[in-house]
Curated annotation (Swiss-Prot):
Gene3D superfamilies: Glucose Permease (Domain IIA), Glucose permease domain IIB. The gene is gamP. The modification Phosphohistidine is found at residue 567. Induction: Part of the gamAP operon. Strongly expressed during growth on glucosamine. Expression is repressed by the HTH-type transcriptional regulator GamR. It catalyses: D-glucosamine(out) + N(pros)-phospho-L-histidyl-[protein] = D-glucosamine 6-phosphate(in) + L-histidyl-[protein]. Residues 3-382 form the PTS EIIC type-1 domain. InterPro entries: Dup_hybrid_motif (IPR011055), Glu_permease_IIB (IPR036878), PTrfase_EIIB_Cys (IPR018113), PTS_EIIA_1_perm (IPR001127), PTS_EIIC (IPR003352), PTS_EIIC_1 (IPR013013), PTS_Glucose_EIICBA (IPR050429), PTS_IIB_1 (IPR001996). The record marks 552 as: Important for phospho-donor activity. Its EC number is 2.7.1.-. This is PTS system glucosamine-specific EIICBA component.
Length: 631
């Protein structure tokens, strides 16, 4: 049950990042257009309209995020939210309810929570009914067209139900808001719990009600009422920003101090290497407020430090509150947001002295703990720890392929997504995931909870996810078996080896392949062949590493350690093995020229995107490829 609950919360957490991602752009427009900066109302209003419609944006964002980017789910969410809103208004009149506050636009206002509910509903109904087949008479409304229809009806029902339930929930939220707003202890626990949830990626769920629902403020100039700490702050509420202000000293001063402590306690021979990594991580935290590169450098090797870190983060919020500091952000508590939004802050200058004091506390406390308890923070590992291996020499455009290998290959991926700083993956077989390889490829940390993995690759995580999905869509085999060959064999091929072309035909460059996975060399260097016959033979003596289930691709390892992928045709994975016959099995030793695979060339030309066959040397650089002898 815990496994399933964690997976659902993970999915919701990453889905919430879709609408949250638009806030920095809206915040920039809102601030630059404000009176204390450019004083251009048209720019300010362009940003303000996003904040005014946050519930609708959350509805669409959550729906699309949970439905795998499907626009139909987003359309259904728009329709569903509009129906929910009007249903709540009409039910409020029937029930004789009074406006929740003076000037309220709606008698029952669920705010962002209503948008999230509709987003969840639209995504669920999309997954449930997007393939439905209706009676031929109603055939036009089958499949995806049915989703907005069923969402409309369901939203009406949800609206009726919540017209009775939501007023009670709203009273509870208001009571909790008042309690926490007046409680320093409550603020401490908020900040500490928020920080403790970050390793699990569940903090997005935790902060949402605080940022977008708790507390209310009526703009005296417009009469508009907004709720939530973040939205109130940007509407000009001088009391807002209480649940954000402590992040500024933590991210701008304290985490860089942690990075410095890690550098100073590293082994002498490793300080230069560790300095480069930690200084980069510290600057990322200082400027943008992205904390994972620093936090995950010590989280897994010294969990006790992260507990201390989280408690101190709570103390920072308390101290800032005692000095009546109020400051906010649209992205995170880094230096950019600090400077940009300073004009809206109250006692924002206090962040600097508080940050400096706590930076000293963090530095000396972390330094003492690392040395006293001999914690294996970066740069302090011994050779026996197995953590001193250099990161795999993988070209940037090939990283996605190797990460997919480390995750156990395409067949092992049940769900793949990403947020700002981490890949979020659900796998079928956790034992096939190589966490050490993920770290060698650049992940600063890997979190495993049952079948769910989070690999912290920083801000490139989302682009990395897209590259992996592109590779998976092309049906490229990346298996755990292939991974073993990467780690156990030499990375450079034997220069004395001589290869033969695995297929007869015209040799062309990878740039001629009509698939960007190959043409952009995401998987490695090589060439392509336009086949003249349907036979694939072993290019050298070696071993069959893997055969894709649909038999359209073979992973091969030569006796000298050269990895070769032979991918027959483009989009041939969609043929489901039709027209292919394998003559070898995974793990089988073969001789140069031995028949590996036969395929119906005419069938592939008729049913696939192209018969052109990429031959990829997956562990060979462009320079090394020049020395490979082909005949």
């Amino acid at each position: 049950m815990f496994k399933k609950a964690f997976q659902i919360l993970q999915q919701l957490g990453r889905a919430l990042m879709t609408p949250v991602a638009v806030l920095p752009a809206a915040g920039l427009l809102l601030r630059f257009g404000d009176k204390d900066l450019l004083n251009i109302p048209i720019i300010k209003d362009a940003g303000g309209v996003v904040f005014d419609n946050l519930p609708l944006i959350f509805a669409v964002g959550v729906a699309i995020g949970l439905a795998g980017g499907e626009g139909v789910a987003g359309l259904a969410a728009v329709i569903g939210y509009l129906i929910l809103t009007v249903t709540l208004d009409n039910m409020g009149k029937l029930l004789g309810l009074q406006p929740p506050y003076e000037g309220a636009e709606h008698l029952i206002d669920m705010g962002v929570f209503g948008g999230i509910i509709i987003g969840l509903l639209a995504a669920y109904l999309y997954k449930r009914f997007s393939s439905i087949e209706l009676h031929p008479v109603l055939g036009f409304f089958s499949g995806k067209r049915f989703v907005p229809i069923i969402t409309s009806v369901s939203s009406l029902v949800i609206g009726v139900i919540f017209s009775f339930v939501w007023p009670l929930i709203q009273n509870g939220i208001n009571a909790a808001s008042s309690l926490i707003a007046d409680s320093t202890v409550g603020l401490f626990f908020y900040a500490t719990i928020y920080r403790l949830l970050i390793p699990f990626g569940l903090h997005h769920i935790f902060y949402t009600p605080f940022y977008f629902m708790m507390g209310e403020y009526t703009d005296p100039s417009t009469g508009n009422t907004v709720t939530g700490d973040l939205t109130r702050f940007f509407a000009g509420d001088p009391t807002a920003g209480r649940f954000m202000m402590g992040d500024f000293p933590y991210m701008i001063f304290c985490l860089p101090a942690v990075a410095l402590a890690i550098i100073h306690t590293a082994r002498p021979e490793k300080k230069k290497m560790i300095s480069g990594v930690m200084i980069s991580a510290a600057l990322t935290s200082m400027l943008t407020g992205i904390t994972e590169p620093v936090e995950f450098s010590f989280l897994f090797v010294a969990p006790v430090l992260y507990l201390i870190n989280s408690i101190l983060a709570g103390v920072i919020f308390v101290v800032c509150d005692l000095f009546h500091v109020r400051h906010g952000y649209t992205f995170s508590g880094g230096g950019i947001d600090y400077v940009l939004n300073y004009g809206l802050s109250t006692n924002g200058w206090v962040v600097i002295p508080v940050g400096i004091v706590f930076a000293f506390i963090y530095y000396y406390l972390f330094r003492f703990a690392i040395l006293k308890w001999n914690l294996k923070t970066p740069g302090r590992e011994t050779d026996e720890d197995g953590q001193n291996e250099e990161k795999a020499p993988v070209a940037k455009d090939q990283l996605a392929f190797h990460v997919l290998q480390a995750l156990g290959g395409q067949q092992n991926i049940a769900n793949l997504d990403a947020c700002i700083t981490r890949l979020r993956v659900t796998v079928h077989q956790p034992s096939q995931v190589c966490k050490d390889e993920l770290k060698r490829l650049g992940a600063v940390g890997v979190l495993e909870v049952n079948n769910n993995f989070q690999a912290i690759f920083g801000t490139k995580s989302d682009a990395l996810k897209d590259d992996i999905k592109t590779i998976m869509a092309g049906g490229v085999p990346a298996t755990a078996a292939a991974l073993d060959t990467v780690t156990d064999k030499p990375l450079k091929p034997d220069s004395d080896e001589t290869f033969i072309y695995p297929i007869k035909g015209e040799t062309v460059s990878l740039g001629d392949v009509p698939d960007q996975v190959f043409s952009e060399k995401m998987m490695g260097e090589g060439f392509a062949i336009i086949p003249s016959e349907g036979k694939v033979v072993a290019p050298a003596d070696g071993e069959i590493v893997s055969i894709f289930p649909t038999k359209h691709a073979i992973g091969f390892m030569s006796a000298g350690g050269t990895e070769i992928l032979i991918h027959v045709g483009i989009d041939t994975v969609k043929l489901n093995g039709e027209g292919f016959e394998a003559h070898v099995t995974s793990g089988q030793a073969v001789k140069q020229g031995e028949l590996l695979l036969t395929f119906d060339l005419n069938y592939i030309k008729q049913h696939a995107a192209s018969a052109i066959t990429p031959v990829i040397f997956t562990n060979t650089s462009e320079e090394d490829l020049k020395h490979i002898q082909m005949k």
